[in-house]
Amino acid sequence: MQQVEHLVDTLHLEDLRNDLHPSIFDDNDDYDMLIVRLPVIIEKLEAISLGFIITQDGSYLFNAAKNRLEDLESRFDGPHHKIDTLLDKLLKSFHSYQDQISDMEETLYDDTVQTNFMTQWLTLKRDILRIERIMHRTSAVMQDMIHYYETDESFPMNHYIDIHEHCERILRSATLQLSKLDYLYNFYNTRTNEKMNRLIFLLTIISAIFLPLNLIVGFFGMNTSGLPFTEGANGTLSVVTGLVLLVVTTSLGVHLWRRKIEYSE
């Protein structure tokens, strides 16, 4: 094991120790280095980097906790098993994102949107964008590895093609969910704007009704002589009756105007 570590370049060892290192395949004379970065969804989205050293005789997995290379059972099957296990878990756990987006879509159709809609939308957008970014790089690296070893008779081509297809499948799913999120965002904005327009329209109607009333009240509030209805016992009743008639007339006019607009649309 120590002999293998002596073969590995110092810079490559630093890459293996880097928990945030992106996926990469680097071929060398004495060994090849493969780093595969994959998303992991447990309670929240995380990402881990698996580092492998592949020699002519075997393969080794870098154990970050123990800071050393550990021998795998076979040259190609060992890395395949580690990567394939994480991909299977990712495929299953990714369904939770799809379910959340479907639920959000249903709430929009049923007009039962929760108050935390945008917070949930931003969280999903951030996580799925991160998954798409990671899987795009990982898929390309796996393709590079397949091309490099395709002439090696001991290389299990079908196994690694299967890994590449899983990467592409997750990538396509992430892209599809992102397009759905964009659609939901536009739909949500449309519904919100409609509600805002209705509110503004209602405020306009209220203003149209009460503005003439305010003018009339202000007129009769002037402390000047010669105001109408100041003489006689039924002056107040006459003013109230006039105000009621004005409200009814204005409301009827606004209603007819609104019906005309709706009919033209």
Question: Language model features by range: what are they?
Answer:
Residues 154, 158, 176-179:
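Leucine-rich repeat
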Residues 1-153, 162, 166-169, 173, ...:
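Peripheral, non-transmembrane regulatory/ligand-interaction domains of membrane transport proteins
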Residues 146-157, 184-193:
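Long amphipathic alpha-helical coiled-coil segments
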Residues 168-169, 175-265:
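Hydrophobic alpha-helical transmembrane segments and their immediately adjacent juxtamembrane loops
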